[in-house]
């Protein structure tokens, strides 16, 4: 039995009948109305439950991102910046609020596979050897394996597994080409590369915004989707360094919570 009120149903006067100007609701009508309000209550509670599940889902994604940042000291904040840039590209494309949130969440955990990489390699204060670089290149595959058993996170798989694919088919791990690469992965690829170029590392200073944009533009049609490259350059030229992801897109639970 419910012990709390979640809403009220207000009934106006019942239309008068031929024989009575002040008709009353019959017991049968009241029974039907009671059944109707019960169904409404169930629908409302289910909606509230979906919202609660969605909030837990979002918090889980943020926790994963925080864990990644804690392991890789030199790329602290990388996931959030990539998410910001990726959502910016999505807005330039005119994507829906639900699609924007999908992009935000996918890009937030795009490097989840690095959890399976040794901290000694992630935090090495210098350039990586060829063997170490191969190990780093395994993180998209490791990330997809981490997500595989978690059905609610499987919708984020393309951004995790394929953000290092190239438009010309020379990327990894699957060697996908052109539009065979999922849209979210093509978006994250640009955002991820831009942030990597403009971020400082122990062994080098980050590139300026202008030089990084020139490099991105040079790689349009080879490494990156040319149309998305144009969208990115339009967005980044308006980008403010203190910009954060604004919560102006609402959850699309049909996309995010599918089993």
Where are these regions (language model features)?
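Short, structured interface segments
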Residues: 39-48, 234
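Metal-dependent catalytic cores of enzymes that make or break cyclic nucleotides
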Residues: 17-27, 51, 55-259
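Allosteric cytosolic regulatory segments
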Residues: 30-41
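Sensory-domain boundary capping and coupling elements
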Residues: 1-19
């Amino acid at each position: 039995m419910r012990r709390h009120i979640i809403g009220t149903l207000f009934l106006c006067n019942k239309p008068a009948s031929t024989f009575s100007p002040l008709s009353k609701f019959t017991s049968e009508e009241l029974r039907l109305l009671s059944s109707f309000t019960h169904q409404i209550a169930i629908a409302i509670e289910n909606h509230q439950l979906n919202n609660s599940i969605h909030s837990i889902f979002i918090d889980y994604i943020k926790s994963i991102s925080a864990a990644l940042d804690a392991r890789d000291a030199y790329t602290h904040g990388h996931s959030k910046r990539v998410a910001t840039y990726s959502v910016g590209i999505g807005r330039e494309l005119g994507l829906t609020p639900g699609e924007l949130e999908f992009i935000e969440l996918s890009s937030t955990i795009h490097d989840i596979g690095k959890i399976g990489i040794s901290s000694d390699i992630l935090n090495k204060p210098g350039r990586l050897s060829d063997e170490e670089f191969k190990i780093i290149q395994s993180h998209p595959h490791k990330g997809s394996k981490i997500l595989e058993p978690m059905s609610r996170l499987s919708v984020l798989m393309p951004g995790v597994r394929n953000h290092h694919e190239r438009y010309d088919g020379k990327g990894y791990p699957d060697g996908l080409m052109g539009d065979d690469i999922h849209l979210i992965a093509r978006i994250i690829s640009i955002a991820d590369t831009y942030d990597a170029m403009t971020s400082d590392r122990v062994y080098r200073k980050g590139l300026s915004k202008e030089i990084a944009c020139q490099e991105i533009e040079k790689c349009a049609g080879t490494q990156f989707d040319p149309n998305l490259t144009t969208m990115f350059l339009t967005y980044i030229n308006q980008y403010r360094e203190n910009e954060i992801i604004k919560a102006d897109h609402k959850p699309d639970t049909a996309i995010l919570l599918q089993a």
